[in-house]
Amino acid sequence: AYTIFHYGVSAWGGYLAIGLPVAYFAYRYDAPFRVSTALYPVVGADGLDGVLARGVDTAAVIATIGGVATGLGFIATQLLAGITFETGRAFGNAETVLAITGITTFFTVSLIAGVSKGIRRVSQFNIGLMTLLWLVALLGGPTLLLLNTGVAALGTYGGNFLDMSLFTGASGGASWSVAWTVFYWSWWIAWAPFVGLFLARISRGRTI
């Protein structure tokens, strides 16, 4: 349930908080594709080139760098941890840096290729790979247990969403909340400018 909670509606709510206003004002009022465009009703068209808007865009860039750096670190360490689990070979900092460099190079090439040729194809490949892994795990593992656990987790998540969202650990367990929920939400907030702009960019022709 907490996995769904940490990666589910709460995370996408942050992305949409930026993506929706940017998409609306960019396509309806011909505003630029910047995070500061969400401030269009407050600062107006002329204010998008002002100090406040520039400050918001600068903060968005810094947050994006932090979010991407954290994601790359997690991906690299999880990849190497999986290899260690299968082979028993341990990896150090040098291998982690090499893995991060390789992943960064791969995604940089996909970005340079553009949305239709690069990112779209990588996304389609990821969806196919995810579907394959899901089918292998579902059909090759304890199928009924996985289905029952998934349904139960959705029920727990739906029934306790408010409690989970507002839990601060005031009477105990604060360290867990900080290490998990607060950490993940901070991570998603850092990703929000990047993902929000991406959603805005691909939303042309779609209604809110």
Please report, for each region that a protein language model flagged, where it lies by residue.
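Acidic, glycine-rich loop-and-beta core segments that form the ion-binding/anion-interacting portion
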Residues: G114-T168
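Hydrophobic alpha-helical transmembrane segments
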Residues: Y2-L20, V56, T96-T101, T168-A192
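Hydrophobic, small-residue-rich membrane helices and short re-entrant helix-turn-helix hairpins
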Residues: R34-V51, L111-M130, G150, V195-I208
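Membrane-interface interhelical loops and short amphipathic "cap" helices
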Residues: A1, I75-F91, L145-V178
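Hydrophobic cores of alpha-helical transmembrane segments in multi-pass integral membrane proteins
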Residues: V9-Y24, G66-T70, N126-A137, Y184-L199, ...
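Glycine- and acidic
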Residues: A60-V68, V115-K117, S177-T181
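Transmembrane alpha-helical segments of multi-pass small-molecule transport proteins
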Residues: R89-V115, L132, W185-L197
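Transmembrane-helix bundle segments that line or gate the permeation/cavity pathway
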Residues: A1-F85, V109, L138-T149
